[in-house]
Swiss-Prot record:
This is ATP synthase gamma chain. Keywords: ATP synthesis, Cell inner membrane, Cell membrane, CF(1), Hydrogen ion transport, Ion transport, Membrane, Transport. It comes from Agrobacterium fabrum (strain C58 / ATCC 33970) (Agrobacterium tumefaciens (strain C58)). HAMAP family: ATP_synth_gamma_bact. GO terms for cellular component: plasma membrane; proton-transporting ATP synthase complex. The gene is atpG.
């Protein structure tokens, strides 16, 4: 049985931890609001850009379409770009993305495909290297980046495009966590290359005028598709930041409440043991008095 001093020290230690988790929750809540606004603002732009590409693609013949849109004509080699957080203490956020990526890799391997992986974020690398160390061709860390910007996404996109141009893969899938709410972040896979053509509404595809493209539609696609890849990566990074902050706020809230419950239990044990010790001392005093 722990002594009164040990219990007192444990109570003080848990209280100190509770202060830290409470502060981390407040910081995450403040960052979440900004991250959520950024993620929600990026969605319409990325969706509309994909729709514009789909509309322009209808005016381009397959034999002159950019390779980034048509692909290599094969699907033998798959590149998975897995985006996770740089730090932990955010519940199951990172493990969910890693599990989703792991399942995708296993599925492709079982189908006889060759899989290559690029990890964006330290936690993704730490989780996947245990099983797929030989498949990871590059790790990208954004630990020193205070605020994720478009330039970070553009660098990742350019790296992916250069690998495609070098013939390193046939299909590229971006894996990230789509932010739904503070308690809901859904791991998602988005095909980057060949550029996935989104399904657009009939009202959007019905042409009410004849468009002339200057330069030609194929040249416009050649320029827009790399930009679209950068935009989609940027959106994924923003979604991840919002999801990470939401998961961290929820995790720190749970930790703060658990610390409170532990403090109550330890305080109860401390009071009971102290009362028992006082009772014992009183009995000894009374017994000594009776002996006299």
């Amino acid at each position: 049985m722990p002594s009164l001093k040990d219990l007192k020290n444990r109570i003080a230690s848990v209280k100190a931890t509770q202060k830290i988790t409470k502060a981390m929750k407040m910081v995450a809540a403040a960052k979440l609001r900004r991250a959520q606004e950024a993620a929600e603002a990026a969605r319409p732009y990325s969706q509309r850009m994909s729709a514009v590409l789909a509309n322009i693609a209808t005016a381009v013949e397959a034999d002159v379409a950019p390779a980034l849109m048509t692909g290599t004509g094969k699907d033998d080699v798959h590149l998975l770009v897995v985006c996770t957080a740089e730090r932990g203490l955010c519940g199951g956020f990172n493990s969910q993305i890693a599990r989703f990526a792991r399942d995708q890799a296993r599925k492709l391997i079982s189908e006889g495909k060759t899989v290559k992986i690029i990890t964006v974020g330290k936690k993704g690398y730490d989780s996947l290297r245990r099983e797929f160390a030989s498949l990871i061709i590059e790790r990208i860390e954004l630990r020193d980046v205070k605020k994720v910007g478009f330039e970070n996404a553009d660098q990742i996109a350019k790296k992916v495009i250069s690998l495609f141009n070098a013939g390193e893969f046939d299909v590229c899938t971006l894996i990230y966590s789509e932010f739904k709410s503070v308690i809901s972040q859904i791991p998602t896979g988005l095909q980057l290359i060949p550029a996935a053509t989104p399904v657009v509404e009939a009202a959007e595809t019905t042409q009410t005028a004849v468009y002339e493209y200057e330069p030609d539609a194929a040249s416009i696609l050649e320029d827009l598709i790399p930009r679209n890849i950068s935009v989609q990566v940027f959106r994924a990074l923003l979604e991840n930041v919002a999801g990470e902050m939401g998961a961290k706020m929820s995790a720190m809230d749970n930790a703060t409440r658990n610390a409170g419950e532990m403090i109550n239990k330890l305080t109860l044990s401390y009071n009971r043991q102290r009362q028992a010790q006082i009772t014992k001392e009183l009995i000894e005093i009374i017994s000594g008095a009776e002996a006299l």
